[in-house]
Amino acid sequence: WLRPGEFLRRLTHPLEADRAATGRAVWAGLLMGLALCAKSWPVILVPALLMLLPGLRSRLVSLVATGVPPVLFLLSLPIGGWTKWSELDDVLNAIGLRPSDVRPITGDWGWTALLSGGEWNLDPTPARIGQYLIYASLVACLIWWRKAHPVDVTIAILLAFMIFTPRLGAQYLLWFMPFLVARPTRWAWPAILGCCLWAAVGYLVLTQFPGEQWYELHKPWAMSSIVLFPLIIAALPWSRRQAEAAAASPAHAQVGEEIR
């Protein structure tokens, strides 16, 4: 942990690389903020975004910039007359990430599909448990891969999310793929191809069947998602807990030189 004096010094007298990255940090934060306006789940990528920046000031600037679009979007609701000021709490509850705020539709993926026999379940208990597991896995990944390359941290967070999420959106299967392609692990492509094949069966083949028949086929398909879990776990960057020295950016090298 930084002493208060050192913390203030890095803010007021940043390294050249940190100062040069400030402009890009603003744009990166604003883009992340726009993503949060569309969906609240990108918040799990914010730690990796901050790790990609070279210094304390650029990270703080990016974090503040990330909060600007959601705040402006939220304030536009009562200002534009679409929502009363007194109803903002209800809006926050509807879009929040607290376990009690998440829609409790489960049974499409993983462990909740096994619990429900592949049927949709409106019981909020599995959804709450899953949310707590996701948050715990996020903290665990940030600790276990704290010295890893930021992309590897992102891979770990997103794959852990896939293991513990109580519900499934088709877009979830796409989140980790660009990062695994950019920095593939040994089991990256088996995990990618397995998820693609599983999704193709569910979204391209099963949807050709009429209602009742689709519903009966959906059950074994949802439960079969558990077969992908060994591939997802194997695809985690287990051997890359520490970033390679040769791959370190000049900015990070400069920070390390100053510390020494």
Residue ranges and their predicted role:
Residues 38, 45-47, 136-187:
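Membrane-water interface signatures at transmembrane helix termini and the short loops
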Residues 1, 11-15, 41, 165-172, ...:
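Residue-level signal for functionally critical sites in structured catalytic/ligand-binding pockets
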